[in-house]
Amino acid sequence: LELIKNLQRIDQKNDYFIFVKPDEDSTVLQETSNFKIIELDGGPYPTWEQIALPKAAKKYGCDILHCTSNTAPFFLDIPLITILHDIIYMESSYLKILKSGASPYQKFGNIYRKLIVPRVVKKSKKVITVSHFEKNRIGEFFGIKDDDKLDAIYNGVSEHFKPITSKEELKRVKNAYNLPDKYFFFLGNTDPKKNTKRTLKAFSDFLKQTGSRHKLVMLDYDKTELNKLLVEINDTNLIKHIILTGYVINTDLPAIYSQC
C-alpha cells in the first residue's frame, strides 16, 4: 500500500493498474488519473493469480507485472518482478507442512508457495527481498548469483507509525479496544512460526513469578485457537489476563504501541 501511495506522489506520467480480488478492502487506496483499481473475479486465490491475473495484465496492455507477496503467475508474456519476503516454506517437506500445527488454510498456502515459488523465481526478471540476510538465503537456495536479478530493498514504514503523544487520541484508542492500563502487545497469528505458544508460556511464567497486573493484548486473534494453546501450556486461567481486540484499524496501531 505504501509503495502505491508513494508512487502516486512521484509519478504522474506512467499508467498503473492495481489488480485486487473483490473481497479485498480496496478503500484504503484512492484512484488517481493514472492509477486505476481493477477488481478481478477469479475464484480462490490460486486460480485468481494463475488465470485471471495474467489475462487482465494482457487485457490492459501492461508492460510489467509486479507481484508483492511471494507468488505470481508463471504463464505470463510480459516481464515479471516478484517480491519474496522469505522462503521458510521452501525449507520444509510437504509431509512436514501437512503435519505442522498450522491451520488448514496456512498449510494450503505453504504448499501452494512451495509449488509455485521455484517457477516464479526462474520466470522473474527481477526478484526483490526485504533484507540482505534473505537475499543471501534466496541466492544460495535457488542458485542466483546475478545481483541484477536479485536485490534487497528494506521495507518502508508508513508515516503514521510514530509515537503518539496526544492524550485525546490515546484515550480514544484505549476506549475503542478496551485496553488496560498496563499491557504487553502481541502482534502475530496462528502460524507456528510466529511462536505464539511460547509467548503465552512466557507470559504465564512472568505472571506467576512476579504477580504483575499486566495484561497481554492480542490483535485479531481467534479465541478458539487461543484456548487450544492455553490447554497445551496447562494454563487455561491465563485467558483472564488476555485482551482480544478483534480487528484493529492500521492507523490505530501507533496509539496501541505507544501505550504498551
Label each residue range with its predicted role.
Residues 1-260:
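Carbohydrate transferase catalytic cores enriched for Leloir-type hexosyltransferases
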